[in-house]
Amino acid sequence: MSDAVPQVGSQFGPYQLLRLLGRGGMGEVYEAEDTRKHRVVALKLISPQYSDNAVFRARMQREADTAGRLTEPHIVPIHDYGEINGQFFVEMRMIDGTSLRALLKQYGPLTPARAVAIVRQIAAALDAAHANGVTHRDVKPENILVTASDFAYLVDFGIARAASDPGLTQTGTAVGTYNYMAPERFTGDEVTYRADIYALACVLGECLTGAPPYRADSVERLIAAHLMDPAPQPSQLRPGRVPPALDQVIAKGMAKNPAERFMSAGDLAIAAHDALTTSEQHQATTILRRGDNATLLATPADTGLSQSESGIAGAGTGPPTPGAARWSPGDSATVAGPLAADSRGGNWPSQTGHSPAVPNALQASLGHAVPPAGNKRKVWAVVGAAAIVLVAIVAAAGYLVLRPSWSPTQASGQTVLPFTGIDFRLSPSGVAVDSAGNVYVTSEGMYGRVVKLATGSTGTTVLPFNGLYQPQGLAVDGAGTVYVTDFNNRVVTLAAGSNNQTVLPFDGLNYPEGLAVDTQGAVYVADRGNNRVVKLAAGSKTQTVLPFTGLNDPDGVAVDNSGNVYVTDTDNNRVVKLEAESNNQVVLPFTDITAPWGIAVDEAGTVYVTEHNTNQVVKLLAGSTTSTVLPFTGLNTPLAVAVDSDRTVYVADRGNDRVVKLTS
């Protein structure tokens, strides 16, 4: 690959290179069409001088493999990576947003509520990375992407390395931006994940003040400030606008001694939230809810659309001028053209046009009405969880995505259950129902919970689980014991009436999602990050890997009364069945299914599946070759599904913050 002559129009393996988006010291970024899947992607091609370096290839392969398994919502996943004709590549999605650096440069400091809301999301991304042995090493505003609805992503994990294998990174290399580098980065002391916490505290301070933590006229003086000077006090720099309690949060996050910092990025985020005034806490929560719902609506794009003039809702002193470019020569991100939200016949039409210029977060702080989540302008940006920093500036274009509307009027047989307390950050995720008709839901968030709605009740109960981190799958057995997976890579159980939870002895889980329990008490887990399904028999301390083959991001698992196991093989767009006590795997004849997610099976062997992208629930009768769509209405990103003995179907309607049931 030449650094001077782009390869636009040429073929790179299965990729047709459509447009050069950016060029950096290590390679180029292209808008490309994956001709196998007929979708537009972001493709990073690493230059020959690095692709030919065995040490570099080993490092990038290790980092891409590790970071590519990070499924935390605030980390952008990669589709694929590898080598073609000796050249290393990384394929990623295109998402919408602008860098935090651009927002701060154009509009100045954020409100405390918005600053904390963004930092809480980045903290969740860091905690997920740290739990997998990955340190980012370059947390800064340039590497934080914020959408028009304030959903935040941490990008550019290309300089990150697996903490357990330092041999792949040269010792002593100063990687990152000096403004956000922890003191130990300059002294040769051991650098741990807490360097990321220091950087996040620096970012929080800059969000509150509009300036990096230390001002210096030389690199040497800047390093000395990190080593010797006290942390800045935002409340002194912006008196009356920043709560003084945030000064202590910044000070602890930027402690010179790593051991004196917060134990986790999440702890820093919680402390920052607690330091806000009550009014600001409500504003921050509103921002988080809106960002989650809007992002769940915006499905990763597959095809291109015509461009139109666009602006983005920013932060600070005023709205941007419609049509103005938002990327400046400091932004380490690449803006690409807009893509369709769903090209497979989903009910998310797209069209060109403008939306209100007033920032959503600013509206929240002023108490004005917030426009519908669908009325958002889009700036399509290329980011990657395992990509190197490639700086590029291009003009942005956008379009409107109309949110599927739904009416409080229920379809025949459809009912919204009276759950409360699940409308915060990616909720609900899992759903289960016991033999008595009690319904359980995981309220997914940075620190989540399990909520129970008793039969006939209009009030909910929070079960006494503790320490759950983004709980996912949920199941309940005949005795009323509740099982839940979370992103601590574990399965936790709570017996009926007990306050003492138990962690089951599963080993090596990597982002477990779906969960099921059979009539014998055996527990099944869709171990998404490892592309497998594991089983733990009742009373056993040793798990078994079930002999499924070719799984790609399995999300849901179910088991019937005969012991047959069913899995939604999400990225392969199929549902597979493993017959009891055999190696016989069968692909079920669901019709044109896309992104299957949740799965359940009733006593008659009918299989129910949610389609994540098309907002449908489909069922396949035992022995049938034709699936049918259930008459749910207004679903928005349905995830888990459950069915009771009366064949009433329950769905976690995540994008609408509700649980819906449909009677047979």
Swiss-Prot record:
Which keywords does UniProt give here? Acetylation, ATP-binding, Cell membrane, Kinase, Membrane, Nucleotide-binding, Phosphoprotein, Repeat, Serine/threonine-protein kinase, Transferase, Transmembrane, Transmembrane helix, Virulence
Q: What class of enzyme is it?
A: transferase
Question: Which residues, renumbered to this chain, carry the PTM Phosphothreonine?
Answer: 135, 169, 171, 173, 209
Sites of the modification N-acetylserine? 2
Q: Where is ATP annotated to bind?
A: 21-29, 44
Mainly localized where?
Answer: membrane
**Effect the entry attributes to changing residue 79 to A:** Lack of activity
In this entry, the parts of the chain located on the Cytoplasmic side of the membrane are: 2-381
Q: What is its EC number?
A: 2.7.11.1
- Describe its function: Part of a signaling pathway that enables adaptation to osmotic stress through cell wall remodeling and virulence factor production. Phosphorylates the osmosensory protein OprA, which inhibits binding of OprA to Rv2638, leading to the regulation of osmotically regulated genes, including the ESX-1-associated virulence factor espA. In addition, directly phosphorylates the alternative sigma factor SigF and its regulator, Rv1364c, which regulates the SigF-Rv1364c interaction. Can also phosphorylate the FHA domain of Rv1747.
Name recorded for this polypeptide: Serine/threonine-protein kinase PknD
Q: What is the lineage of its organism?
A: Bacteria, Bacillati, Actinomycetota, Actinomycetes, Mycobacteriales
What gene name is listed for this protein? pknD
